[in-house]
């Protein structure tokens, strides 16, 4: 083979190898494209486990579930239409209280990022229950927690997180700027009511689905304030109670009917010699019952009951088992204010069952410590101090605080009645303990007609923290 033939042969072999290599590269590209095109989901968002996301779009809850199978994400959607929380059912018959949640916020906050809070409360939609709370714009064990014993400041905000979780920046949702608040769900969206501003001219901002829809101006220019617990919804309307005026004398009290975040009707109570603050309200058979705090001169609790047209009745719980704090020892009650130790008070609640009443109260008659539930079968109308059931919630040696009611509607539970529930705030820090801060955790219970147990579920945090030393 002469030199020219060698050159031609080598060139031909190189050309064949090049063509084969090019074909292999083209085949590899086609293979990658085909493999990518048959996958569904977003390959840039790898999910290590299943994840459910609930979004809200045009009055419809959209439940999106991402299922991770062999690095391939399949998106499934199930639309859950909004409902109207009717509130027409009666309260469920119950024999005791089953523990529902405990957030352990102070214990976790010694090392984790947990908000400094007060006035926590719980409210439920037809899909979920959430804990609402008033922050101080500060975290536990941080310098900004200093001086948070103060009730009203421009830094306080209403936020919420899933029930039973410690309130932190990572799981909490901003709701409103507020130093007094309420919230509830009508089956379509959350209504929030946040009061902020100066004592002599505060304004309540109403939001529906997170959007400002209305405002209410202080009408007596004397610390307008609201429930610090959930409002109550019946047939698409939500109802709340507000107070404006002295905390130690005759004040003014209004009930409001709110639809889709707008006030459609209000009524001022004609209630001389009554004092209503921080009402705990619930629906029962289409009407609203609120049990409140008398900070003026009653150691028993005042109540107001009204229908959807705001036609109302007023009274005091008659039982000789007194529900406020401070209070005298149990004795003979009154259907008006019981004066001994009637000054000051604490937010609380009761549930009416005919002539009977479940009374929640601190165990101590003088300090905010301990908690118990008492069934007085004649206590709504009778003045004796006889009761038939007592269930321990927090021991008298442990701190408690505010308490309030919430309900779970049949649309959530699947029952044919409204389940009564309550929460208890477990206050820690100032003014009773040697810290620079005041905060709290919470526990909650729901009524059941089955076995229950009395015990003590205290806050349990060991104080002081590092910041306090």
From Swiss-Prot:
Topological domains, Virion surface: 34-469
Region (Involved in apical transport and lipid raft association): 11-33
Family: Belongs to the glycosyl hydrolase 34 family.
Broad class of the protein's primary localization: virion
Gene Ontology cellular-component annotations: host cell plasma membrane; membrane; virion membrane
EC number(s) reported in the record: 3.2.1.18
Note: The influenza A genome consist of 8 RNA segments. Genetic variation of hemagglutinin and/or neuraminidase genes results in the emergence of new influenza strains. The mechanism of variation can be the result of point mutations or the result of genetic reassortment between segments of two different strains.
Quaternary structure and partners: Homotetramer.
One Pfam family here: Neur
Organism of derivation: Influenza A virus (strain A/Hong Kong/212/2003 H5N1 genotype Z+)
Topology versus the membrane: Single-pass type II membrane protein
Annotated active site: 151, 402
Protein name: Neuraminidase
SUPFAM superfamilies: Sialidases
Residues that bind substrate: 118, 152, 277-278, 293, 368
InterPro entries per UniProt: Glyco_hydro_34, Sialidase_Influenza_A/B, Sialidase_sf
Gene encoding the protein: NA
Cofactor: Ca(2+)
Chain residues that bind Ca(2+): 294, 298, 324
């Amino acid at each position: 083979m002469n030199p020219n033939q060698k050159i031609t042969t080598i060139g031909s072999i190189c050309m064949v190898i090049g063509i084969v290599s090019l074909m292999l590269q083209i085949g590899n590209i086609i293979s990658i494209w085909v493999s990518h095109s048959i996958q569904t989901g977003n390959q840039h968002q790898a999910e290590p486990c299943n994840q459910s996301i609930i979004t809200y779009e045009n009055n419809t809850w959209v439940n999106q579930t991402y299922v991770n199978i062999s690095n391939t994400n399949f998106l499934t959607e199930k639309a859950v239409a909004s409902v109207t929380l009717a509130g027409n059912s009666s309260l469920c018959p119950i024999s005791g209280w089953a523990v529902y949640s405990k957030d352990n916020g102070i214990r976790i906050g010694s090392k984790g990022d947990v908000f400094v809070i007060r006035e926590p409360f719980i409210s439920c939609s037809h899909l979920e229950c959430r804990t609402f709370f008033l922050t101080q714009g500060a975290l536990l064990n941080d310098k900004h927690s200093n001086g948070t014993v103060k009730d009203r400041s421009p830094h306080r905000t209403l936020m919420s997180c899933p029930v039973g979780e410690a309130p932190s920046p990572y799981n909490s949702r901003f709701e409103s700027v507020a130093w007094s608040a309420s919230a509830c769900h009508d089956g379509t969206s959350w209504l929030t009511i946040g009061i902020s501003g100066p004592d002599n001219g505060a304004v309540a901002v109403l939001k529906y689905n997170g959007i400002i829809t209305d405002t209410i101006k202080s009408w007596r220019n004397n610390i307008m304030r609201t429930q610090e617990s959930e409002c109550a919804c019946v047939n698409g309307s939500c109802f709340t109670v507000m107070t404006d005026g002295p905390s130690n004398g005759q004040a003014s009290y209004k009930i409001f009917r709110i639809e889709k975040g707008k006030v459609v009707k209000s009524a001022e109570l004609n209630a001389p010699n009554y004092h209503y603050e921080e009402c705990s309200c619930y629906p029962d058979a289409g009407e609203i019952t609120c049990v409140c705090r008398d900070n003026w001169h009653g150691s028993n609790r005042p109540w107001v009951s009204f229908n959807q047209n705001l036609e109302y009745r007023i009274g005091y719980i008659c039982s000789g088992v007194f529900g406020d704090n401070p209070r005298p020892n149990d004795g003979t009650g009154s259907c008006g204010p019981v004066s001994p130790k009637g000054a000051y008070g604490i937010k609380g609640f009761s549930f009416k069952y005919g002539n009977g009443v479940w009374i929640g109260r601190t165990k101590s008659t003088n300090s905010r410590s301990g908690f118990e539930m008492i069934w007085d079968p004649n206590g709504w109308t009778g003045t004796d101090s006889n009761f038939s059931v007592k269930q321990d919630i927090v021991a008298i040696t442990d701190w408690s605080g505010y308490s309030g009611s919430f309900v779970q509607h049949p649309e959530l539970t699947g029952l044919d009645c409204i389940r009564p529930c309550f929460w208890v705030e477990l206050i820690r820090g100032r003014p009773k303990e040697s810290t620079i801060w005041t905060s709290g955790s919470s526990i909650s219970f729901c009524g059941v007609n089955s076995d229950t147990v009395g015990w003590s579920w205290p806050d349990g945090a060991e104080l002081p923290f590092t910041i306090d030393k």
